[in-house]
Structure formats: C-alpha cells, structure tokens
Amino acid sequence: MEYRVTDIITLLNAEYKGEVVEKVSKLSPFFHSDEKSLTFAADEKFLKNLSQTKAKVIIVPDIDLPLIEGKGYIVVKDSPRVIMPKLLHFFSRNLKKIEKMREDSAKIGENVDIAPNVYIGHDVVIGNNVKIFPNVTIGEGSIIGDGTVIYSNVSIREFVEIGKNCVIQPGAVIGSDGFGFVKVNGNNTKIDQIGTVIVEDEVEIGANTTIDRGAIGDTIIKKYTKIDNLVQIAHNDIIGENCLIISQVGIAGSTTIGNNVTLAGQVGVAGHLEIGDNTMIGAQSGVPGNVEANKILSGHPLVDHREDMKIRVAMKKLPELLKRVKALEEKK
C-alpha cells in the first residue's frame, strides 16, 4: 500500500522542504527503514544522524536543519512525539469484520489438528502438522509455521508471525498493544501500535507470558529462545538466539538482547538499552543500562556476581557492626 506525502503534510498541518517525494509505503523506525519509508526524528539522537537513515522522507521539528541530497523533510510545528497518535492512526490497518469461526480466506496446511472453539481469522496461513488446542484465537493475517503447537486459551493477534516447531503454552498473549501513550493537552493519549511480533523457529513461550507488538517496526524473538511463564516483553524488543528468560522477567520497550543471554527469575530490564551476547543476569536483579557481552552480573545496582555475593555476606554483618560502632562512639 502507498500513501501520498501530500496527504501526510495536510494531516499534520506541516510544511515540506528538500527533495520532492510523492509517495511512501510505510512508517518505519529511524535506523530500520528503507527508501520507501517515512520516519521521524524526535530528538537530538536522530537529528544529528539524519544522513544515516535510509528513509527518503523524515518528519522533523521546526528548527534550522541542513538539507540532505535525496531526502525531504516534513516540518511540523508541534513536537514530533505530540503528533504521533495522529500519525500512527493514519498508518494503522483496518481489520476485516469477523464472520465465522474459521474465515473462508484462511489457508490450512496438511495434517493440522484444530480443536473445537478455535477462531482462525481472515488470510491466516497455518503450515503442516500444526496442533491447536481449544479456545485459541489467531488474528487476521497471522502466519503459523509447520509443526508448531499452540495450547489452550492462547491469543495471537493480527499479523503475527510464528515460526516452525514452536511451542506456545496456555494463556500466552502474542501481539497485544504495547504500552504506548503520549501527553496531548495534558491527557494520556493512546498511540496505535502498527508493528507486529515475529517469533522465529524453535521458540517456546511459557504460560501467561505476554509479548507486545511493535509501535513502529516489530518485536522479534529469535530462534531457539525459550521463555518461561509470566514474562512480559514490551514493544520493539529484540531477543536474540538461544536465550533463556525465566519466570517473571520484565523487559521494557526497545531493548535489544544478544544471543545466548540468560535472565534469571524476576529480573527487571529498563528500556532502550542493549545486553551483549553470552551474558547472565542473576535473579531479582535490576538492569538500568547497557551490559557488555560475556558478563555474569547480579544485584541492584547491577555488579559483577562475585562482588554482589560479597556485598550480601557483608550486609548480614551490618547489625553487629553497628553495635560495635555505637559502643566505640560511647567510649569517646
């Protein structure tokens, strides 16, 4: 689908500068765009790297910016973040009306076992040897790879992609809206989440785990990663290959986790950061910033695991040490 740039300019009450581009096909993240994309630069991180995006049309604030050959600017008077609800709604896809439990346009492979009370939406593609248990919902345009097993009460929303030989345990929700809101006139205003979730081959997703769809771009779970029960993965996260994510981990949005990473139970990971390959984070730790590869860390704040163990041992001695300090002060 293509969108006229002039319609977007009118929608945003904006001006245009630079190379004339008539149409774009999608809204994409700044560093993950192509020549058919529209993207936006909301802050200094992006504004100083305008030449680094492949998008030919960029939404920018009304400030003095150098023109770049081959690129056009849609200049908005409001902050680019303020116009986000309007912009993402413009690019959101309208879903078809639900008509029956298995829509006629759905394509079902060979040797597929579908239990009663399963909804299969318009244009869904289900591969061979898939097993789907009762009370599952598979939304419009989703793709389920060969050999995947989907247990009861799983919700897979529209346009989600599930790879081959995956296992999705009961109650998991894949493709729910990310927690995306901005303040408009002092009110929390929802931003349409127009991305999706891509789950690669051989992934397991635990019971009652939730994986949010991307706001712009996709949330990605790479092959052979195993996710335990009751895990929250937010919008636009990228989880690498062969990761282990244990129960009650929460990962905030737009975080990238490398390959072979282990996050132990109840780890909290902040948003917009990177965790390097082969890293292990101990249980109940907090991750507030980037983590280098090949580290074993724990605690809050996060430190080397051996140092964290020494701190915990020392903390047990604090009551006795305080008594000794008080006694020494009284002798003065």
UniProtKB/Swiss-Prot annotation:
Molecular function GO labels: N-acyltransferase activity
SUPFAM superfamilies hit by this protein: Trimeric LpxA-like enzymes
CDD domains assigned: LbH_LpxD (cd03352)
Catalytic reaction annotation: a UDP-3-O-[(3R)-3-hydroxyacyl]-alpha-D-glucosamine + a (3R)-hydroxyacyl-[ACP] = a UDP-2-N,3-O-bis[(3R)-3-hydroxyacyl]-alpha-D-glucosamine + holo-[ACP] + H(+)
Catalytic center residues: 235
Pfam families referenced in this protein's UniProt entry, alphabetically: Hexapep (PF00132), Hexapep_2 (PF14602), LpxD (PF04613)
GO process terms (BP): lipid A biosynthetic process
Coiled-coil stretches: none
The enzyme's E.C. designation: 2.3.1.191
EC category: transferase
Pathway(s) served: Bacterial outer membrane biogenesis; LPS lipid A biosynthesis
Keyword tags: Acyltransferase, Lipid A biosynthesis, Lipid biosynthesis, Lipid metabolism, Repeat, Transferase
Primary role: Catalyzes the N-acylation of UDP-3-O-acylglucosamine using 3-hydroxyacyl-ACP as the acyl donor. Is involved in the biosynthesis of lipid A, a phosphorylated glycolipid that anchors the lipopolysaccharide to the outer membrane of the cell.
UniProt subunit comment: Homotrimer.
Protein name: UDP-3-O-acylglucosamine N-acyltransferase
Lineage: Bacteria, Fusobacteriati, Fusobacteriota, Fusobacteriia, Fusobacteriales
Gene this protein is translated from: lpxD
